[in-house]
Amino acid sequence: MANVLMIGFPGEGHINPSIGVMKELKSRGENITYYAVKEYKEKITALDIEFREYHDFRGDYFGKNATGDEERDFTEMLCAFLKACKDIATHIYEEVKHESYDYVIYDHHLLAGKVIANMLKLPRFSLCTTFAMNEEFAKEMMGAYMKGSLEDSPHYESYQQLAETLNADFQAEIKKPFDVFLADGDLTIVFTSRGFQPLAEQFGERYVFVGPSITERAGNNDFPFDQIDNENVLFISMGTIFNNQKQFFNQCLEVCKDFDGKVVLSIGKHIKTSELNDIPENFIVRPYVPQLEILKRASLFVTHGGMNSTSEGLYFETPLVVIPMGGDQFVVADQVEKVGAGKVIKKEELSESLLKETIQEVMNNRSYAEKAKEIGQSLKAAGGSKKAADSILEAVKQKTQSANA
């Protein structure tokens, strides 16, 4: 039995994929301590593993806006993220420096995890919940945030100072700005398949593609499945971050009021059902729904294009209409369209007529469903949590044997 330190990134799309891997490692006898924000305590302790809390930095990093419309200086965001990583790493290191661990697992986008592994001089494994990124790919994604160059920002000097401090005092290994968001490991576990990964040939053996980590989730037992079990189901969700979308949700109510089947609309926690326009009889509107169970039944998924939601939709062979709002969603959306598993609507072009036209096109053209099925089969064949655990444990074994040789 090995002692494992896990450091997760706050967000459903980051925590959920890690759950299956933690569950699998625990079943192999590993003893896991999992650091995350308080919001995920119940989800983690349900696995019968130790939960420890670190400060939730998302208000500083993402801001208060959940529409995807807020423009922020990218260098300012870098600074906020580096400050958060410094604080998290300091907090965790003080708690674990006198404890005994055998290896560290962390979210690929949480630099603090890599820092802790380096400071403890332990093998490190990152869980990548987006596409695997190289420098070219990372620059493309960063371009979605950036207005002008980093050097033009009034926050650039602060960024340089923070990066230098983290390199000198925390072994952060920041050489270029994209290193702040891409904390690679001795192995990087990527939750997609090589069949869906852009530029897959550029990623070698240190990248293990396992497909999405699909695990049953607790809660929402009151969802009226009897209303959708024998229906044509259209599922609409904008995820958990960019879901303050009252105007969009009202557009959906209007566009889909004559849909021949049931429309399941997940609106998140920012908007109350009472704030929306009149809800048609063919709609089920909830703050949160059991997404996996809905996707098993859905004919079409209208999504923001978060990697986790997209992967889950395709895993269940559901064609997509993608309306990206921010971050890596633009890259994910482009790949969905490139492989033919769905269509993209740019948020600045969104209208009721375009939404209706796009939904009808994807529903009525069987090629989208066929491509979604093809990608879904590649995701299922990638190996999932079992392959992730196998790869981590084999790497740990090899490192141990090498150290003892």
UniProtKB/Swiss-Prot annotation:
What keyword terms does UniProt attach to this protein? Glycosyltransferase, Transferase
Does this entry carry the keyword Aminoacyl-tRNA synthetase? no
Q: Which residues form a coiled coil?
A: none
Has the keyword Phosphoprotein been applied to this entry?
no
Q: What protein family does this chain belong to?
A: Belongs to the UDP-glycosyltransferase family.
The record's PANTHER family line, in alphabetical order, gives: EG:EG0003.4 PROTEIN-RELATED, FI06409P-RELATED
Protein name per UniProt: Uncharacterized UDP-glucosyltransferase YojK
- Species this protein is from: Bacillus subtilis (strain 168)
Gene transcribed to yield this protein = yojK
